[in-house]
C-alpha cells in the first residue's frame, strides 16, 4: 500500500487555515474612526516633537483644478486693462473658490494661485479669507503648501491691523447679496491666530514649514516691514518668489514700511518671545544658533529684542541676548567668547552673529570689538564665512577705530584680491568715504596688488581675461586659507559653507563682485579713483568697446561718466573715444546704456555732444528698427534735434532746468492757465477786501 503523505497534508491544512483567517479579516467591518496617516518627515520637527495628525480637507475635482489652473495663468500674465478689470476677475475667482479655500491652499497645483490671489486682493477680500482660515492655522502653518499661503496672508493683512471693520460696507454687501463682512477686525483675527498657536511655540521654532510663517507673524506684531524683496529682510531668503503686481512702486508698497499696531500687540509679542525661549535652557538656546531652521527665527527674536524693545532689554539677565552672551568683558575663555568663536566660522551661526553685531548696544559692541574681534580682524577677513561678519563690524566702527582697521587690513588686500574676495576691501572703501578717512593707503595697496601698466590693471580689476579655470596657485591659496585661522573642531562639510566656496570660485560671481568693487573705488575722491580713471584713459578703442558691451563691466564706464569724482577734463578726453562707434553701441543692450550716459557726460562739452548727435542722426533707420536703439533715440531727444535744433541745443547745454531736474517742463497753455488763475485769485481777494 502506498504511504499516506502526512507532511503534504499538514502543510495543506495549515495553508487552508491561514487563507480562512485572512478572509475573515477582510470580511470584518471597517472601523468608524478614520485610520491614522503615517507621519512623514514633514510632520515632525527636527527635535522629534510630534505635531499631531494632519487633517485632510479634501481634493479638488478635475473641472475645478482646470478652472483654477487657467485662473493662475491669467494672474501670472497680469495683462488686465486696468485695476478695476483685475479686481472684478479676482472677485470672480473668490466666488468660485467659496467653500474650497482650504482645499486650494493645501493643493500642490493650486496653492500658488491662492498666494497670487491674496497678493492682488483688497483689504475686504483678505478679511473674508482670513476668517475662513481661523481654527485651522495650527495645521496650515505646518503644511508644505498651505504654510506659504498663511505667510502671504499675514504679509498682506499687516497694513490693515489698525483699521476697524466698516458696518456701512457690511450692510451694503448684505443688501447686494454678497458674502457678508466678518465681524472680527484683522487685529482680532491675528489674536485668534496667537490663541491657536499658544503652547506650541517650542516645536514650531524648528518646524520646517511653520518657522517661515512664525517669523512673519512676529514682525507683524512688532509693526516692522515684512517685505520679502528687501535686501536686508530677516524674513526669508532672497530666492523667495514675490507675487503681486510687478509695476508696484516701492514707495507705495505698504508691506515695505513700518506700521502702527494696536497696543495689545506689544504685550502679546513680549509674551510670545518669552514663551518661545523660556522652555529652553541656555545650552539648548545656543544650539539654535547653528540649527538651519531655528537660526532664522532666533535672528528675528534677537533683532526685535534689540531694536524694538530698546537697549534696556539687553541688560535684563533673562533676555535672549544676555542668555546668549552673558559676559560683556569678552575675555579669552569665557562663555561669550567660546560661543562667538563657534559662530564666526559656522555658515549658519555666522548669520546670527551678523544680526547681533548690527543691532547690539554700542557699549556692548565696543567691548566685543576691542577685547575680541580687533586682534583677529586680519584672519577673519581671509575666511569666506567670517568675512561677512567683518563687513558688519566695519559698518559700526567710528572714525578712529576705522583708521585703525585700515592699518590692520591694508596689508591683507593684495592677498584678498588674489583670491577674488573683494567684499571686505569694497566695504572698507565705502566706510572710509562715509567716515571721511583717508583712502591713500588703500590706493597704494591696490597698486601693488595689480599690474603697474594702467591698461592691464583695468583688465585685471574687471577679470576680463579668461577665468574659467582655477589656477594651481589659487588652489594652493584656498587650501592655505583653511589654516589661516583656528576653527572649531566640528565644522560640517555640507550646506552653505560649500555654497560660499563655489560662489567664490565661480567666474561669473567673481566678475560681478569685481565690477562692484571698481564702481565703489570710483566714488572715492583722490588717488584711489585716479587708479581707475587713468586705466580707462589708457584703454584702446577696441578694449573700450569690449568693456562697454559687457553686461557686467559696462557699469564701470557708465559710473565713470556720471559720478561727481569724474572731472570735466576726464570726460572731455574720454567721451571722444566713443565717436565713430555710437551706432554699434546703441544697438547693443549694454552699450546703449553707455550711450545714454554720454548724454549727461557731455553737458559741459557741447561740441562733442553735437558731433555725437550728428552720428546718431545718420543711423536713424537702424536705431528705429531696434528696441534699444529707439530708447537711445528717445533719450537723446533726436526728434527734437531734427525738428527744432535751437530747443535741442538749449536742452543739451543744460539750460532746460525743468527737464534736467527730472520734472516735465510746463507747456505754454499750462503757464497761461497759471497766470489766469493767479489773476482770478487776486481779483477775488480785492473783491473780498472791498466788501469788508
From Swiss-Prot:
Residues 1-53, 163-182, 466-507 are annotated as: Disordered. Residues 11-41 have a biased composition (Basic and acidic residues). One of its GO terms (biological process) is endonucleolytic cleavage to generate mature 5'-end of SSU-rRNA from (SSU-rRNA, 5.8S rRNA, LSU-rRNA). Keywords: Nucleus, Repeat, Ribosome biogenesis, rRNA processing. It is found in: Nucleus, Nucleolus. Pfam families: PUF_NOP9. The keyword rRNA processing applies. Its main location: nucleus. GO terms for molecular function: RNA binding. Belongs to the NOP9 family. This is Nucleolar protein 9. It comes from Aspergillus niger (strain ATCC MYA-4892 / CBS 513.88 / FGSC A1513).
Amino acid at each position: 500500500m502506498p504511504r499516506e503523505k502526512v507532511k503534504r497534508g499538514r502543510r495543506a491544512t495549515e495553508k487552508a487555515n491561514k487563507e480562512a483567517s485572512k478572509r475573515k479579516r477582510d470580511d470584518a467591518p471597517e472601523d468608524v474612526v478614520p485610520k491614522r496617516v503615517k507621519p512623514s518627515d514633514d510632520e515632525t520637527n527636527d527635535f522629534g516633537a510630534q505635531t499631531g495628525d494632519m487633517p485632510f480637507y479634501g481634493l479638488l475635482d478635475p473641472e475645478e483644478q482646470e478652472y483654477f489652473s487657467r485662473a493662475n495663468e491669467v494672474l501670472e500674465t497680469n495683462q488686465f486693462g486696468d485695476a478695476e478689470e483685475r479686481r472684478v476677475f479676482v472677485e470672480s475667482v473668490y466666488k468660485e473658490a467659496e467653500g474650497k479655500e482650504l482645499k486650494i491652499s493645501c493643493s500642490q497645483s493650486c496653492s500658488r494661485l491662492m498666494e497670487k490671489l491674496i497678493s492682488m486682493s483688497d483689504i475686504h477680500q483678505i478679511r473674508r479669507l482670513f476668517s475662513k482660515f481661523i481654527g485651522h492655522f495650527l495645521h496650515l502653518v505646518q503644511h508644505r503648501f498651505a504654510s506659504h499661503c498663511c505667510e502671504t496672508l499675514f504679509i498682506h493683512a499687516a497694513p490693515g491691523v489698525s483699521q476697524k471693520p466698516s458696518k456701512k460696507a457690511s450692510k451694503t454687501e448684505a443688501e447686494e447679496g454678497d458674502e457678508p463682512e466678518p465681524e472680527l477686525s484683522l487685529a482680532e483675527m491675528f489674536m485668534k491666530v496667537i490663541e491657536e498657536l499658544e503652547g506650541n511655540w517650542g516645536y514650531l521654532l524648528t518646524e520646517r514649514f511653520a518657522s517661515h510663517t512664525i517669523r512673519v507673524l512676529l514682525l507683524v506684531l512688532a509693526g516692522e516691514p515684512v517685505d520679502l524683496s528687501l535686501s536686508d529682510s530677516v524674513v526669508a531668503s532672497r530666492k523667495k518668489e514675490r507675487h503681486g503686481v510687478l509695476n508696484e512702486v516701492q514707495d507705495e508698497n505698504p508691506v515695505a514700511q513700518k506700521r502702527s499696531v494696536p497696543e495689545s500687540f506689544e504685550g502679546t509679542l513680549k509674551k510670545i518671545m518669552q514663551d518661545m525661549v523660556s522652555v529652553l535652557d541656555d545650552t539648548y538656546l545656543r544650539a539654535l544658533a547653528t540649527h538651519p531652521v531655528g537660526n532664522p527665527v532666533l535672528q528675528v527674536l534677537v533683532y526685535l529684542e534689540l531694536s524694538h524693545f530698546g537697549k534696556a532689554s539687553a541688560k535684563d539677565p533673562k533676555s535672549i541676548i544676555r542668555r546668549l552672551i552673558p559676559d560683556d568683558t569678552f575675555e579669552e575663555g569665557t562663555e561669550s567668547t567660546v560661543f562667538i568663536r563657534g559662530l564666526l566660522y559656522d555658515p549658519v551661526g555666522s548669520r546670527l552673529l551678523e544680526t547681533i553685531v548690527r543691532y547690539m548696544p554700542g557699549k556692548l559692541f565696543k567691548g566685543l570689538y576691542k577685547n575680541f574681534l580687533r586682534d583677529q580682524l586680519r584672519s577673519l577677513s581671509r575666511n569666506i564665512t567670517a568675512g561677512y561678519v567683518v563687513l558688519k563690524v566695519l559698518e559700526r566702527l567710528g572714525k578712529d577705530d576705522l583708521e585703525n582697521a585700515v592699518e590692520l587690513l591694508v596689508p591683507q588686500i593684495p592677498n584678498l584680491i588674489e583670491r577674488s574676495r573683494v567684499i571686505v576691501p569694497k566695504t572698507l572703501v565705502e566706510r572710509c568715504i562715509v567716515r571721511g578717512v583717508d583712502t591713500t593707503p588703500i590706493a597704494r595697496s591696490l597698486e601693488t596688488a595689480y599690474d603697474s601698466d594702467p591698461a592691464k590693471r583695468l583688465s585685471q580689476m574687471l577679470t576680463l581675461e579668461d577665468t574659467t579655470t582655477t589656477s594651481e596657485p589659487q588652489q594652493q591659496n584656498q587650501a592655505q586659507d583653511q589654516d589661516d585661522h583656528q576653527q572649531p573642531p566640528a565644522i560640517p562639510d555640507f550646506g552653505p559653507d560649500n555654497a560660499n566656496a563655489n560662489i567664490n570660485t565661480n567666474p561669473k560671481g567673481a566678475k560681478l563682485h569685481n565690477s562692484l568693487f571698481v564702481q565703489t573705488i570710483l566714488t572715492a575722491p583722490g588717488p584711489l579713483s585716479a587708479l581707475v580713471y587713468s586705466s580707462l584713459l589708457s584703454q584702446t578703442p577696441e578694449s573700450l568697446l569690449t568693456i562697454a558691451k559687457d553686461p557686467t563691466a559696462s557699469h564701470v564706464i557708465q559710473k565713470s561718466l556720471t559720478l561727481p569724482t569724474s572731472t570735466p577734463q576726464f570726460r572731455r578726453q574720454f567721451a571722444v573715444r566713443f565717436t565713430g562707434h555710437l551706432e554699434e553701441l546703441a544697438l547693443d543692450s549694454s552699450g546703449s546704456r553707455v550711450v545714454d550716459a554720454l548724454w549727461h557726460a557731455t553737458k559741459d562739452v557741447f561740441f562733442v555732444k553735437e558731433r555725437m548727435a550728428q552720428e546718431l542722426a545718420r543711423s536713424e533707420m537702424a536705431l528705429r528698427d531696434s528696441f534699444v536703439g529707439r530708447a537711445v533715440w528717445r533719450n537723446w531727444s533726436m526728434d527734437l534735434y531734427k525738428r527744432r535744433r535751437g530747443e535741442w541745443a538749449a536742452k543739451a547745454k543744460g539750460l532746460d532746468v525743468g527737464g534736467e531736474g527730472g520734472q516735465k517742463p510746463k507747456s505754454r497753455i499750462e503757464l497761461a492757465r497759471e497766470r489766469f488763475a493767479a489773476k482770478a485769485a487776486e481779483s477775488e481777494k480785492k473783491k473780498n477786501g472791498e466788501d469788508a
